[in-house]
C-alpha cells in the first residue's frame, strides 16, 4: 500500500516499503519545501511527477549511479574537451539552467520539472545545496545541468543541450571536478543510454543507502564559486 505523507512531518517510510511496480514508488503527497527535499535526498528518494499529479517520491531498485573514477570519456568528446570549443561555469545562472531543463523536448511535450519544482530547487540553490553547470559558446548558454551536493555525494537532476555535445562537455567537466573535490558517487537515479555511455551502472538500492549513511556527512573540497573552465 502506498504511503501518503503528512504535511506536518518530514519523515519518509523505510525504503524497503517502495513498490515493485511501478518500480521504486515510495510515497505520495507532502510538499516541496526545502527541508522536505533535503530530507528526501538524505533518505534516498526524490520527487518525480507530472502536472496534475500528486507529488510522487521514488527510490528505484536498482539505482543508477556513476563512480567518478569510472567516468568514460569517448575519443570524440575528449577531443572536444581539449579543443575548448565551449567554456564551462558553475553556479553562474542556475535559474536559466533549470528553466532550459524544464522546456519541452522534441520527444516529449510534457515536463516533470513543473513550476513548483523550479521554485523549490531555486530555494535549494539560494541555500547553497543545489548547483548548476553552464556551458557557453561565447556568451550564449548552449547546455548545462543541475543537481544537489551533499557531503561527498552529488545528486544529478536534469541536463539540457542546444548545441552538439554541450551537455556532455558540462557533465564530463563536472565529474572531473567532483573527482578532484573528493566526491565518491554521483546519483543518476534512472538508467539511460546517455548515462551508461559515461560509465554509469546500476547498484542495489541497499548499497546506495549504505553510501548515503557513510558519505552524506563527510566533508568535501567542493568550491562552487564562479569559475571559467
UniProtKB/Swiss-Prot annotation:
Its main location: cytoplasm. Gene3D superfamilies: Leucyl/phenylalanyl-tRNA-protein transferase, C-terminal domain, Leucyl/phenylalanyl-tRNA-protein transferase, N-terminal domain. GO terms for cellular component: cytoplasm. Keywords: Acyltransferase, Cytoplasm, Transferase. It is an enzyme of class 2 (transferase). One of its GO terms (biological process) is protein catabolic process. It comes from the Bacteria. It is found in: Cytoplasm. Pfam families: Leu_Phe_trans (PF03588). Its EC number is 2.3.2.6. GO terms for molecular function: leucyl-tRNA--protein transferase activity. Functions in the N-end rule pathway of protein degradation where it conjugates Leu, Phe and, less efficiently, Met from aminoacyl-tRNAs to the N-termini of proteins containing an N-terminal arginine or lysine. This is Leucyl/phenylalanyl-tRNA--protein transferase. It comes from Pseudomonas savastanoi pv. phaseolicola (strain 1448A / Race 6) (Pseudomonas syringae pv. phaseolicola (strain 1448A / Race 6)).
Amino acid at each position: 500500500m502506498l504511503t501518503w505523507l503528512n504535511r506536518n512531518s518530514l519523515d519518509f517510510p523505510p525504503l524497503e516499503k517502495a513498490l515493485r511496480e511501478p518500480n521504486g514508488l515510495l510515497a505520495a503527497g507532502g510538499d516541496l519545501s526545502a527541508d522536505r527535499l533535503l530530507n528526501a535526498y538524505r533518505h534516498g528518494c526524490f520527487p518525480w511527477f507530472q502536472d496534475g499529479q500528486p507529488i510522487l517520491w521514488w527510490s528505484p531498485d536498482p539505482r543508477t549511479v556513476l563512480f567518478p573514477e569510472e567516468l568514460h570519456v569517448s575519443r570524440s568528446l575528449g577531443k572536444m574537451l581539449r579543443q575548448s570549443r565551449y567554456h564551462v561555469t558553475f553556479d553562474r545562472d542556475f535559474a536559466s539552467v533549470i528553466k532550459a531543463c524544464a522546456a519541452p523536448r522534441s520527444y516529449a511535450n510534457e515536463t516533470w520539472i513543473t513550476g513548483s519544482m523550479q521554485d523549490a530547487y531555486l530555494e535549494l540553490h539560494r541555500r547553497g545545496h543545489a548547483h548548476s553547470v553552464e556551458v557557453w559558446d561565447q556568451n550564449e548558454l548552449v547546455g548545462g545541468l543541475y543537481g544537489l551536493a551533499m557531503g561527498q555525494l552529488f545528486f544529478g537532476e536534469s541536463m539540457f543541450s542546444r548545441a552538439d555535445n554541450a551537455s556532455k562537455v558540462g557533465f564530463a567537466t563536472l565529474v572531473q571536478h567532483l573527482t578532484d573535490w573528493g566526491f565518491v558517487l554521483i546519483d543518476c537515479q534512472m538508467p539511460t543510454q546517455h548515462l551508461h555511455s559515461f560509465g554509469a551502472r546500476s547498484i542495489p538500492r541497499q548499497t546506495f543507502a549504505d553510501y548515503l549513511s557513510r558519505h552524506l556527512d563527510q566533508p568535501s573540497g567542493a568550491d562552487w564559486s564562479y569559475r571559467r573552465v
